[in-house]
């Protein structure tokens, strides 16, 4: 009988695993700098090559970035929806997936999130204020065509982020971010033949308000139906303008640097009354 041999982890993998646990558990915060190499040598009792390999493993994981020069060091990064979306978008691009594929997935998945939002017992504090805030921003900036699509997309991203289920927030939220970058590129970039017309924008904003009303009332079935109808219309409008390309991962990579970027999980919003941003 053949003896099954188990591969022993290398020293570098053990060091990387310990540091990874420190990052994911929150013992090391976003933006923290890892201790100096001399300190890590002393803590783990490993050779310089093993420590460098451990740092490289964490860098490949996206959990640290190494700064060079006088202010150098290994800076900690916690996993985010944006980084997850970037990884998913790279896989989708490698498989030649298109915006049509992503939007079809969202047509099936986002209405589920809408229903979950409406079914939350704490929706009046954990869902409604966030969606009201987004609609307030949309309304205040309605005439600024360059801001309409990013603002509208954040309503959808917020809807998913408040559904109350962390795996769905991460996975569906990543698809939302991928679709958001495509839709913004279509309407605000070179691909669009014309800006979104006033009638279309008003209809979309009205749909958002109706969806919010259904969620506020706790009517999950109506929230699902409204989300399905709204997503179908939005998908038709966008895909009629731009469908030619596969998913572009570089658009997601640039997400954190865009001026209108906001985290997927919002802090508690202020009142949307009088918003002028």
Where are these regions (language model features)?
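Conserved amphipathic alpha-helical segments that form helical-bundle/coiled-coil interaction surfaces
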Residues: 102, 106-189, 207-210, 222-236
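Short, conserved clusters of charged catalytic residues that mark active-site
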Residues: 59, 97, 154-155, 206
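Short linear motifs at protein or domain termini
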Residues: 1-108, 112-115, 119, 246-248, ...
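Short helix-capping and inter-helix turn/linker motifs at the boundaries of alpha-helical repeat units
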Residues: 10, 146, 201-203
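Surface-exposed charged/polar residues within alpha-helices that form helix-capping/stabilizing sites
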Residues: 21, 25, 39, 140, ...
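Hydrophobic/basic alpha-helical segments enriched in Actinobacteria
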Residues: 27, 32-39, 94-98, 121-128, ...
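C-terminal all-alpha effector/ligand-binding and dimerization domain
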Residues: 178-277
């Amino acid at each position: 009988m053949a003896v099954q041999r188990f591969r022993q982890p290398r020293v570098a993998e053990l060091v990387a695993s310990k540091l990874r646990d420190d990052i994911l558990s929150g013992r090391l915060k976003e933006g923290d700098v890892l201790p100096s190499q001399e300190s890590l040598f002393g803590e783990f009792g490993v050779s310089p090559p093993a420590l460098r390999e451990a740092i490289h493993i964490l860098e490949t994981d996206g959990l640290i970035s190494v700064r060079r020069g006088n202010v150098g060091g290994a800076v900690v990064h916690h996993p985010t929806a944006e980084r997850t979306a970037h990884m998913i978008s790279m896989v989708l691009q490698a498989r030649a997936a298109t915006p049509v594929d992503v939007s079809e997935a969202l047509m099936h998945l986002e209405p589920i999130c809408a229903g979950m939002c409406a079914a939350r017992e704490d929706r009046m504090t954990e869902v409604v204020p966030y969606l009201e805030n987004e609609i307030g921003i949309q309304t205040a900036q309605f005439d600024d065509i360059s801001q309409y699509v990013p603002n509208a997309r954040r309503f959808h991203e917020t809807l998913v982020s408040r559904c109350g289920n962390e795996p769905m927030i991460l996975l569906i939220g990543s698809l939302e971010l991928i679709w958001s970058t495509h839709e913004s590129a279509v309407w605000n970039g070179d691909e669009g033949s014309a800006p979104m017309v006033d009638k279309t924008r008003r209809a979309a904003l009205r749909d958002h308000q109706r969806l919010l009303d259904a969620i506020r009332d706790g009517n999950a079935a109506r929230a699902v139906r409204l989300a399905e109808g709204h997503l179908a219309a939005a998908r038709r409008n966008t895909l009629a303008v731009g469908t030619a390309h596969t998913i572009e991962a570089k658009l997601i990579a640039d997400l954190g640097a865009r001026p209108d970027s906001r985290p997927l999980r919002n802090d508690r919003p202020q009142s949307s009354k009088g918003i002028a941003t």
